[in-house]
């Protein structure tokens, strides 16, 4: 080890250990008498690795790189349970394997340390979230270190550390200072857009922007008939604040009024997936719809690129399909319907409703229109007679999340009293509102074709609305016709055509009549980037003269506040801070929202490459060397949000020339969950009386989770339960006949909220980290869900103990450890090398453990002494799974340096050829016995031996042999 750098060269520095403590021996170890003292072994090697900086890594252009990354954890107060390390163990196995294969491996770890749980605790206790977060991180770090992971801890990052979020703020600032060129398909500096406006206005500018952005301007500069086009003279005549407002509509990070899920109890905006049945998933608090001024991210500009580059990624089809569904690209037409009176004549307002449809060929079948309750034109359509009903319905819809509205099959809606003019028939089309139409998808309005859409058909039947039949020979009495091969009827020139034939004609007609355009629509919406929370990244934004300005000269850190709740006016917690409470203050006011939880996690994989750089987020030469993450391992719950945002930010940074690749994760594995066995008690509704499991159906009961540590073989510790839940200290329990209370049970997700978690700490203390590592891999395929069961862990522990004993006996051989082993032993080892290598290349982590068990059993059963040529390769094979024990075994064989730096062994073909083959011998297709024969025998020789075997004569029972079929190396079939 170089004392000045702390870097470690395993091959060079481990010789110091050997020289100091005896050739071929670890520090002070007598292998001849050693048992498997896993506590001493693991403590020793963890200390050795740490002292020597064994896992520190630097760029090395002479070696190929490999980047293995885990989805970093949120450090909760509960610490790790046994489900958390599953992916970490798999990534560690793979990282060690690649190191053995000669790669320069980057394998870092950090913490996604901003988050709501720490803030909720701060609200309850008044303790600053930074304190609890740091305490939780220390606990996580200790748990991770005891498992022997090869993380380069010198690269640790924390998203809540100002030295980290300084660069999150910088990336946001770059997004704020950029626009998206839809023609060149790239992000460009906003200054270039300003220059273009100054030279030519916005003519020939191809920029992603807010739809109808000019309708939202707060200044009357252009007049009521402005269509969004302006000249250079117009631009130059604008004031600075007016230019700022126009530019905001084109920035990639921008301010806009947005309808959000607002949770008053939590005091923040929630994402759609954080709301269920109108309640927050965390805490079950009511959630309502609310329009707020929010920071947004123009991810929609990247929608097509996010779709197109999926094909080049080594991800599962299910993950790619989830991304495609979330982005939701569809081709069709935008059609405009003019506001009209009840006779279909334009009402003179000039207002139009734009709808998107993928089936413009069904335009003849439109019999009503449905708007989302939040659509901005609802108020203008609503008649006085309908206003009360419309307002009541809007209020009801505001209490539902988009997910609830999409999943609710109940039919509901209200007629507004207004109409639009049908562009084809010129007739009046009634306008309704219904919560199955979402403001955030498409235009927030649909043209309803009940003959061709099942949802529209049910709505029309429920409210007795017309269902014009536009299909030839189709009965609509029971359902709509959704067959795209159906023939159109009563559709003018489109009659007699299928959808495929009619859609191009419909698109041509719509554009010729100037009532719409060909359009590509995406389900994905621009992402809300504001949160009304304290514990998040503050924005590097100040306000002056009514305009938002980027702060570039310093990091904006969180101010002191007197409470972590929103203000009485509903302002974010940061609004509580006075000017003197802010470490940094610029302008007239500071932005008081904070960034969402996904901000810091959208680029952390880049910071690992250069974590201590104070002048840039990552030096280009470092990102060029490490490049994309080669293998990313994490839960499937992140297959949409996190991956989309990370891909979006990566493409943006690529566009602006900061990195040389536009996809962050080349390969990815989503590990399955380790499931826990939950226990339940049954309370009679509205009482403090509990009934045992067998009596639960005789009463109206509520099932409650109970801590599994209070349950033994389904029997509940009643005293322990009363102490755990003091509110039930005086509860009555109706017991089984034998006086026990039996709980119910169910296998489900292991989580703190289900009270079914098992700590890895207890298992490490009892069996050791190597045993836990091997056991979690042994449970089953990494990608599958698996119930947690410790019944098999002792078997894995015994396997490691047996391995240790085998090496101990070999080291105690008279005359020392032989250099060579028997041919039989080498066959066993090289068969294991071939199997383990193939399994690791296929990420079949579980079957490696089985292969190693078989090898150790076969080697232990042999009578010949084992030598270095068998034991050293076996120690290397074991190293990714049981690194502590493998180091010990490697030292016992006088291995050079550290086992982790040993070259991965190659299976020698000569030892993979079997010298004996087991032939099943069948008679007329039925196997009757087996024969062990030399692998070198020719088919004719095999046939002769079978014919002469006395068991063949017994099977013939006097019959003659018609022929003998020998499949070399496989089977013999005697045909009688």
Predicted feature locations:
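Residue patterns forming the tRNA-binding/recognition surfaces of aminoacyl-tRNA synthetases
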Residues: 35, 48-52, 125-353, 360, ...
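Amphipathic alpha-helical
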Residues: 296-330, 372-414, 557-582, 874-903
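Long, charged, mostly alpha-helical binding arms that flank functional sites
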Residues: 36, 329-334, 472-508, 512-519, ...
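Helix-rich, typically C-terminal accessory recognition domains appended to large enzymatic cores
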Residues: 183, 187-188, 249, 254-261, ...
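Catalytic alpha/beta core of large soluble enzyme barrels
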Residues: 91-92, 104, 345, 375-475, ...
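Basic, alpha-helical terminal appendages of large translation-related enzymes
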Residues: 2-3, 13-65, 360, 372-375, ...
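Conserved oxyanion/phosphate-binding beta-strand-loop segments in alpha/beta enzyme cores
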Residues: 31-69, 99-108, 132-138, 312-315, ...
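N-terminal catalytic cores of NTP/NDP-binding nucleotidyl/phosphoryl-transfer enzymes
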Residues: 58-133, 157-168, 357-358, 362, ...
């Amino acid at each position: 080890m170089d004392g000045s750098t702390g870097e470690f060269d395993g091959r060079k520095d481990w010789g110091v250990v050997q020289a100091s403590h005896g050739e071929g021996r670890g520090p002070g170890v007598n292998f001849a008498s050693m048992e498997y003292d896993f506590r001493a072994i693991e403590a020793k090697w963890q200390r050795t690795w740490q002292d020597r900086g064994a896992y520190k890594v630097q760029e090395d252009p002479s070696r190929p790189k490999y980047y293995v990354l885990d989805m970093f954890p949120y450090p909760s107060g509960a610490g790790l349970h046994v489900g958390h390390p599953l992916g970490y163990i798999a990534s560690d196995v793979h990282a060690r394997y690649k190191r053995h294969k000669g790669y320069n491996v980057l394998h870092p770890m950090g913490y996604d340390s901003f988050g709501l749980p720490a803030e909720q605790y701060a609200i309850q206790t008044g303790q600053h979230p930074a304190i609890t977060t740091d305490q939780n991180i220390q606990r996580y770090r200790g748990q991770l270190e005891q498992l022997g992971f090869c993380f380069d801890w010198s690269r640790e990052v924390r998203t809540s550390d100002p030295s980290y979020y300084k660069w999150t703020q910088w990336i946001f600032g770059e997004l704020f200072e950029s626009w998206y060129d839809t023609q060149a398909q790239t992000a460009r500096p906003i200054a270039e857009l300003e220059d273009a406006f100054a030279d030519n206005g916005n003519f020939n500018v191809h920029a992603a922007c807010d739809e109808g952005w000019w309708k939202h301007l707060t200044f009357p500069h252009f007049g009521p008939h402005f269509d969004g086009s302006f000249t250079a003279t117009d631009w130059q005549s604008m004031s600075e604040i007016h230019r700022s407002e126009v530019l905001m509509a084109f920035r990639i990070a921008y301010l806009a009024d947005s309808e959000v899920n607002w949770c008053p109890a939590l005091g923040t905006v929630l994402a759609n997936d954080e709301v269920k049945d109108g309640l927050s998933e965390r805490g079950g608090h009511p959630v309502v719809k609310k329009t707020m001024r929010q920071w947004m991210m123009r991810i929609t500009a990247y929608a097509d690129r996010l779709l197109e580059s999926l094909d080049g990624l080594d991800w599962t089809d299910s993950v790619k399909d989830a991304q495609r569904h979330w982005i939701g690209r569809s081709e069709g037409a935008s059609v405009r319907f003019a506001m009209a009176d009840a006779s279909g004549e334009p009402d003179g307002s000039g207002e139009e409703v734009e709808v998107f449809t993928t089936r413009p060929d069904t335009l003849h079948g439109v019999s009503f229109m449905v708007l989302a309750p939040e659509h901005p034109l609802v108020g203008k359509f609503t008649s006085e007679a309908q206003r009360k009903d419309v307002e009541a319905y809007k209020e009801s819809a505001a209490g539902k999340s988009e997910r609830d509205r999409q999943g609710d099959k109940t039919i509901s809606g209200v007629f507004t009293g207004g109409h639009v003019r049908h562009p084809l028939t010129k007739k009046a089309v009634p306008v309704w509102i219904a919560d199955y139409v979402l403001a955030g998808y498409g235009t927030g309005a649909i043209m309803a074709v009940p003959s061709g859409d099942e949802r529209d058909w049910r709505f029309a039947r429920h409210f007795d609305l017309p269902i014009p039949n536009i299909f030839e020979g189709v009965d609509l009495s029971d359902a709509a016709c959704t067959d795209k091969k159906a023939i159109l009827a009563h559709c003018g020139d489109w009659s007699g055509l299928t959808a495929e034939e009619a859609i191009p004609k419909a698109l041509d007609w719509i554009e010729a009549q100037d009532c719409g355009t060909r359009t590509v629509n995406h389900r994905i919406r621009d992402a809300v980037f504001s949160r009304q929370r304290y514990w998040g990244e503050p924005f590097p934004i100040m306000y002056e003269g009514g305009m938002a300005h980027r702060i570039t000269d310093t990091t904006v850190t969180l101010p002191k506040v007197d409470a972590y709740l929103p203000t009485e006016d509903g302002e974010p917690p940061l609004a509580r801070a006075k000017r003197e409470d802010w470490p940094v203050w610029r302008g007239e006011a500071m932005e008081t929202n904070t960034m969402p939880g996904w901000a810091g996690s959208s680029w952390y994989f880049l910071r690992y490459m250069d974590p201590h750089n104070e002048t840039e987020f990552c030096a280009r030469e470092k990102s060029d060397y490490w490049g994309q993450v080669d293998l990313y391992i994490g839960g499937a719950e992140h297959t949409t949000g996190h991956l989309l945002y990370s891909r979006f930010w990566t493409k943006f940074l690529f566009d602006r020339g900061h990195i040389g690749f536009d996809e962050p994760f080349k390969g990815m594995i989503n590990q399955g969950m380790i499931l826990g066995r939950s226990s339940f008690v049954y309370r009679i509704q509205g009482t403090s009386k509990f009934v045992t499991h067998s009596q639960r159906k005789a009463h109206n009961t509520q099932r409650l989770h109970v801590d599994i540590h209070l349950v033994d073989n389904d029997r509940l510790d009643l005293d322990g339960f009363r102490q755990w839940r003091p509110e039930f200290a005086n509860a009555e329990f109706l017991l089984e006949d034998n006086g026990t209370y039996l709980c119910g049970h169910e296998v489900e997700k292991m989580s703190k909220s289900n009270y079914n978690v098992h700590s890895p700490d207890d298992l490490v203390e009892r069996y050791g980290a190597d045993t836990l590592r091997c056991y979690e891999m042994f449970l089953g395929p990494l990608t599958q869900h698996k119930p947690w069961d410790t019944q098999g862990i002792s078997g894995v522990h015994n396997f490691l103990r047996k391995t240790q004993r085998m090496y101990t006996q070999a080291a105690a051989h008279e005359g020392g450890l032989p250099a060579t082993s028997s041919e039989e032993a080498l066959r066993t080892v090289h068969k294991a090398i071939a199997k383990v290598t193939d399994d690791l290349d296929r990420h079949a982590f579980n079957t490696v453990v089985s292969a190693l068990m078989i090898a150790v059993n076969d080697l232990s059963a042999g009578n010949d002494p084992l030598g270095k040529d068998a034991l050293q390769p076996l120690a290397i094979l074991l190293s990714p799974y049981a690194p502590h024990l493998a180091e010990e075994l490697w030292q016992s064989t006088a291995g050079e340096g550290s086992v982790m730096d040993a070259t991965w062994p190659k299976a020698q073909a000569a030892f993979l050829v079997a010298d004996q083959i087991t032939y099943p011998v069948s008679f007329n297709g039925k196997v009757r016995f087996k024969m062990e024969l030399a692998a070198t025998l020719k088919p004719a020789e095999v046939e002769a031996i079978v014919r002469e075997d006395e068991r063949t004569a017994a099977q013939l029972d006097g019959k003659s042999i018609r022929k003998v079929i020998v499949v070399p190396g496989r089977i013999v079939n005697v045909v009688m």
